[in-house]
Each structure stands twice: as C-alpha cells, then as structure tokens.
Amino acid sequence: MAKKSIGQLKLQVPAGAATPSPPIGPALGQRGINIMEFCKAFNAATQEMEKGAPIPVIITYYQDKSFTFSLKTPPVSFFLKKEANLKSGSKEPGKVSVGSISRDKIRSIAQAKMKDLNANDIEAAMRMVEGSARSMGLEVVG
C-alpha cells in the first residue's frame, strides 16, 4: 500500500546551506519532519550546485513522518542579477534602468530554466525571461 501524503511544503533554501535554524527548522518541525535528516539530504543533493543559489524545494510529507523532496532551478531573477552583475533590481522599473542584458544571455537563462517554465519552446521561454528582466529594470539589447 502506498504511503498517504498529508501535505506539501514549498521553501526556498540556499544551495548547500540548509540548517536547522529559522526559517527551515520551525517550518519542518511543526509538521513533524525530521529537520536534520532533511538538511543532510538537501545539502547532499545540492552539493554540485552553486553555493548560496536560492533553490526552490517542494517537500511532500507523509503520515509516518517520512518525506520526499524535489528540487527546482533557481529563480529567473537570480540568473538575471548574476549575468548583469547586480545586487538588486530597479526601484522604479520602466523609468530607471539599472543595466542591460543581451539576448544571448537571455537564451542561456531560458535554456537553464526550460524544465521549470510553462513554455512549449525556447522562444516562449525567452519572452518570459525578457519580461522578468524588464520588470527588474534591465534593458534587453541585441
């Protein structure tokens, strides 16, 4: 008989940096999930990824207090800030530009995010990434 799932939890955790401290510990503890077991498994799974990259994780937990988790790719904003060498986006997007990004970099970001985006082809994914770039105050050139 299959285990009965009692819920899902979505978190964004820095790659290789899961610790039992807040916000991870309390979120898992109140659901009865073994915090240290999750931290060890998550850190092992994100070992090859860029340290500190925010990784969205979906944790499914079961009645017997066990859990499974699936990792997503980092958010588009993380890739855009990294490619454009920015600390943060514009405070007034559309009015104040904080930098520019080329279509080639947009394409590489879209390819990296393709499995998590709701897009049928790379062109649609590129349009989504371009929209995020404009919302952050980046100019798309090329």
Curated annotation (Swiss-Prot):
One of its GO terms (biological process) is translation. SMART domains: RL11 (SM00649). One of its GO terms (molecular function) is structural constituent of ribosome. One or more lysine residues are methylated. Keywords: Methylation, Ribonucleoprotein, Ribosomal protein, RNA-binding, rRNA-binding. The keyword Ribonucleoprotein applies. It comes from the Bacteria. InterPro entries: Ribosomal_uL11, Ribosomal_uL11_bac-typ, Ribosomal_uL11_C, Ribosomal_uL11_C_sf, Ribosomal_uL11_CS, Ribosomal_uL11_N, Ribosomal_uL11_N_sf. GO terms for cellular component: cytosolic large ribosomal subunit. Forms part of the ribosomal stalk which helps the ribosome interact with GTP-bound translation factors. Part of the ribosomal stalk of the 50S ribosomal subunit. Interacts with L10 and the large rRNA to form the base of the stalk. L10 forms an elongated spine to which L12 dimers bind in a sequential fashion forming a multimeric L10(L12)X complex. Belongs to the universal ribosomal protein uL11 family. This is Large ribosomal subunit protein uL11. It comes from Bartonella henselae (strain ATCC 49882 / DSM 28221 / CCUG 30454 / Houston 1).
